[in-house]
């Protein structure tokens, strides 16, 4: 479904949790979906990605530094929140992008990326200020100044 809808403009780079990396099968869509699950440095994948689609992984905290769009594929949010682990933040109110519950919603958000960016711009800024603002390349300088003050 995604290849048919997005394949002319996008490719998908997949980086799963290492526990399930071997289970990912991209047979039949190798020219559209690339399994990078065993690629060591996820930050390099962030740099070449236009959009981050994640679930409950902490990767969005790091990806947010790039100020690029994010989608949160949360098809099982009720179970994850209420039964499995819970969350550190209020996902519905604080995430810097939409929660989507189906592949169709993922596709729709990607097709309407400009509208999504506008809708979540303010929330993204609040999130960035809260979680990313001191990650500005000057952390060592601040640490030295604090220690040798």
Language-model features: where?
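Acidic donor-binding loop of glycosyltransferase active sites
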Residues: 47-58
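Short amphipathic alpha-helical segments and helix-helix/interface helices
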Residues: 1-3, 60, 144
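Catalytic donor nucleotide-activated moiety binding site of glycosyltransferases and closely related
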Residues: 1-36
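Catalytic binding pocket for nucleotide-activated donors in carbohydrate/polymer assembly enzymes
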Residues: 25-31, 58-131
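C-terminal alpha-helical cap of glycosyltransferases
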Residues: 136-149
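Acidic, amphipathic alpha-helical patches
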Residues: 42
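Short beta-strand/turn micro-motifs composed of small residues
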Residues: 14-16, 54, 74
